[in-house]
Design a protein with these regions (language model features):
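Small/polar-residue-rich loop-to-helix segments that shape phosphate-bearing ligand pockets
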Residues: 1-63, 81, 94-145, 150-151
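Conserved small/polar residues in nucleotide/adenosyl-binding loops
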Residues: 254-261
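Active-site-adjacent helical/loop segments in soluble small-molecule enzymes
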Residues: 129-187
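Short glycine/serine/threonine-rich phosphate/pyrophosphate-binding segments
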Residues: 1, 68-77, 100-101, 169-176, ...
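Short glycine-/aliphatic-rich beta-strand segments at the starts of folded cytosolic domains
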Residues: 211-225
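Catalytic phosphate/nucleotide-handling subdomain of diverse soluble enzymes
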Residues: 179-208
């Protein structure tokens, strides 16, 4: 889609921060205009039109859930909805291993994360935007964090309902909605789904982790004695619970010989 408008695409780095630094460097060297991915008033305003679309399409909403990376989408949508219908609550949703907004809210100032998880690479940002944070503080009702397992379960939900494969970041808002809905009832909730940039190799991992995210499976790491009957005793502990997969690793501890030996 981008190439169809005549743009040149340069792939650089393994995450957003590396790509952003490269883009800033090129813009400075070639004296070009840099359009920030999220931390620009015009970018925020453009993304805010989604808020208008939501209110035009749905009435009597109780809450809207928005995925958070740098905060542009959340700032734009929350600003529009807050001005139109203040009764609608707005929640940002983050992955717990890249929760830059959550940390900023706790500190009441922008915080730069030391490490950022890359599973939901579409929202893998180490610091919330300056402009976006100013808007979010005024217009957003709360921030919800979800685990990777809960995120994978949301990807599965979208596929089962629509037969559309969402990328992890695209299913983030739904994961937050599900977590919120588990504590509420009789509420009309809406989640923004954005993004389908999913590598095929990730599908198997998502399928496995979604079972954990839906509390259908548990992953256990257990040490048992290396002697006959140990596995049978373990199975008896589980009772009627079903073991869907079992990986066994034999660990032999020994002291390596010294040069003198």
């Amino acid at each position: 889609a981008v190439r169809s408008f005549g743009a040149k695409i340069l792939l650089h780095g393994d995450n957003y921060n590396e790509s952003s630094k490269k883009a800033s460097s090129i813009a400075k060297q070639k004296k070009m205009e840099l359009i920030h991915a999220f931390d620009d008033p015009m970018t925020i305003a453009g993304q805010g039109t989604i808020g208008k679309e939501i209110l035009d399409a749905e009435d009597n909403l109780d809450a809207v859930f928005v995925p958070v990376g740098g905060g542009g989408l959340l700032a734009g949508v929350s600003a529009w909805i807050a001005q139109q219908k203040k009764k609608v609550k707005i929640y940002g949703v983050e992955v717990d291993d890249s929760a830059c907004l959550t940390e900023a809210v706790k500190a009441n100032k922008r915080v730069k994360l030391r490490e950022v998880g890359l599973f939901a690479d579409g929202v893998a940002v180490d610091q919330i935007g300056l402009h976006t944070f100013d808007v979010i503080k005024e217009c957003v009702d709360g921030v919800i964090t979800v685990s990777i397992d809960e995120l994978c379960a949301a990807v599965k939900d979208i596929f089962e309902d629509t037969r559309i494969l969402s990328e992890p970041a695209g299913a983030l808002a739904l994961a937050g909605l599900k977590k919120y809905a588990s504590k509420m009832s009789n509420k009309k909730l809406l989640a923004i789904s954005s993004g389908a940039n999913l590598n095929f190799e990730r599908l198997n991992y998502i399928v496995e982790r979604s079972e954990v995210g839906e509390n259908r499976e548990k992953l256990l790491s257990i040490q048992i004695p290396e002697k006959p009957g140990s596995f049978l005793k373990l199975c008896r502990v589980f009772g009627r619970s079903q073991i869907t997969e079992f990986n066994y690793r034999f660990c032999l501890l020994y002291t390596s010989p010294s040069p003198r030996d």
